Amino acid sequence: MKIKTRFAPSPTGYLHVGGARTALYSWLFARNHGGEFVLRIEDTDLERSTPEAIEAIMDGMNWLNLQWDEGPYFQTKRFDRYNNVIDEMLEAGTAYKCYCSKERLEALREEQMAKGEKPRYDGRCRHSHEHHADDEPCVVRFANPQQGSVIFDDQIRGPIEFSNQELDDLIIRRTDGSPTYNFCVVVDDWDMAITHVIRGEDHINNTPRQINILKALNAPVPVYAHVSMINGDDGKKLSKRHGAVSVMQYRDDGYLPEALLNYLVRLGWSHGDQEIFTREEMIEFFSLGAVSKSASAFNTDKLLWLNHHYINTLPAEYVATHLQWHIEQENIDTRNGPQLAELVKLLGERCKTLKEMAQSCRYFYEEFAEFDADAAKKHLRPVARQPLEMVRDKLAAISDWTAENVHHAIQATADELEVGMGKVGMPLRVAVTGAGQSPALDVTVHAIGKSRSVDRINKALAFIAEREGQAS
């Protein structure tokens, strides 16, 4: 049997982290078994589904590189198929037309609730032999079995049982002729030969209804696995107050897809004590039996730690391809300065996100308008003039412009002045970067370049002279 899984989001918003984890688990399970992964867009909610949401889902899947083997399928393009199956069920007696008015159903609901009963349809039209005109409005209901129970072996939670007496005669076609969500899902899983349905625990109550419809159609019943919810680190349902919840927001915030995938796979699944997983290791080790029944807590600090790890361990050339987008968002012209892969090596230790990296690299490529006020006040003082003049001349004299030779020039200046490296290094750092913090000074100056570094030191010396003039 070929394993076939699916990810079936509703395009009513962005791809959130809970949906992304479900997609990841479904994708990993299929890949682990040499199977296929299907993308299906469940867009039957015509009022809330939008093209923008569909695009956001596709963007998120592509950014995470969760490539599908089939699809994307759209339920709105399959309405004829659903209605044909409903018509066949009406003929077979496994579905029936219901003419009950909204007023009757509401009165029935209020009566049942007043008695402390669970609101459910009473089956009036199921047994009715009244004649109705062909154009009289009606819905179509599934004739759910009235005896026995539905038992399925959830691959995460174990056996789950529902009494058929607790299940309603589900509406499968509305008065406007449109099929309902639960019915479309059943026909899709049947037609697409889905063998394993991996989805959120909020779908558990749908499962017995869908199983009963599948059995009425004499269709194979897939294996089900329901994944627990993701909470914030405070134990409450994950929401925007806990940070980003959209996959593409994490892209915008400077996270690598490898970091988010690694974090999501560990939200409810484990393989021993291992924390870092390559994509290949995820595929090799993943199993539903190792997925926890308990809710997971989203910890942004842990995700940030993983992102920092991947920035520094993935090939710099690859990280640079993701950094490029953030550089463009900051409108930085990188034609005059280090290659982005070199920038990743320079700033990787200091920056935990690519957004932070893009926002802190401008001085490598463009001139800064002014020095940081606090850094200049502390380090661009008259006492710094001599160290800056000496190190400027030594840098200008370097014929082989390497980080090592830059280091020698700084060290030689400190040695000749008989001062610590900080007495030379800190004024130099402020002079060439405009601020008081940067990566190691030798590699920073080397990356900025000789001509630009010398020009900036001269600018700093002019700043010191102007400051002296104002003081006098």
Swiss-Prot record:
Motif ('HIGH' region): 9-19
Gene Ontology annotations of biological process type: glutamyl-tRNA aminoacylation
Motif 'KMSKS' region, residue numbers: 237-241
Gene Ontology MF annotations: ATP binding; glutamate-tRNA ligase activity; tRNA binding; zinc ion binding
Catalytic activity of the protein: tRNA(Glu) + L-glutamate + ATP = L-glutamyl-tRNA(Glu) + AMP + diphosphate
Subcellular location: Cytoplasm
Main location: cytoplasm
NCBIfam families the record matches: gltX_bact
Family to which the UniProt record says this protein belongs: Belongs to the class-I aminoacyl-tRNA synthetase family. Glutamate--tRNA ligase type 1 subfamily.
PANTHER family tied to this protein: GLUTAMATE--TRNA LIGASE, GLUTAMATE--TRNA LIGASE, MITOCHONDRIAL-RELATED
Protein name: Glutamate--tRNA ligase
Lineage summary: Bacteria, Pseudomonadati, Pseudomonadota, Gammaproteobacteria, Enterobacterales
